[in-house]
Swiss-Prot record:
One of its GO terms (molecular function) is chorismate lyase activity. It holds the Pfam family Rv2949c-like. One of its GO terms (biological process) is DIM/DIP cell wall layer assembly. It catalyses: chorismate = 4-hydroxybenzoate + pyruvate. This is Chorismate pyruvate-lyase. Removes the pyruvyl group from chorismate to provide 4-hydroxybenzoate (4HB). Involved in the synthesis of glycosylated p-hydroxybenzoic acid methyl esters (p-HBADs) and phenolic glycolipids (PGL) that play important roles in the pathogenesis of mycobacterial infections. Its EC number is 4.1.3.40.
Amino acid sequence: MTECFLSDQEIRKLNRDLRILIAANGTLTRVLNIVADDEVIVQIVKQRIHDVSPKLSEFEQLGQVGVGRVLQRYIILKGRNSEHLFVAAESLIAIDRLPAAIITRLTQTNDPLGEVMAASHIETFKEEAKVWVGDLPGWLALHGYQNSRKRAVARRYRVISGGQPIMVVTEHFLRSVFRDAPHEEPDRWQFSNAITLAR
């Protein structure tokens, strides 16, 4: 999958609701509840614990030194009443770097990752997200989810705790929900790590 990061100028052209969601640095489901005017629920599509982190670029972002086991979690955020699919997300979580209570809650409930982390009171730092327009993740179609568009705005960020990366989260904002997104011309996107939305 090729990722062409969006410049600040391209991000400012996105629909207001989508800009709010991209800029959200807290619990995405809380913001999405307001933007979508619906109770947002988590549907776990698939999750798996890897005893050793696979050789994938996303796993490498967790760091190779003593990463231990990794929980790979695919989820959909959707409206309870509308049943609209809002976000498709993948999380890679270094579970040996977190308390067992967090892992138990993640693997035995449908609670949103952000809510689980907020309730744990663990001090974390969310790195600045990289934003791009790209293909929807392949796992979405493999599990029977269809979307009228094949591309979406996405963001990826790492969460750090105790000086170590504990998770990498990739979120795809499903374009059929956000109506006035930019034209899909991937060759126009400029590379940028800066997402300065508040000016």
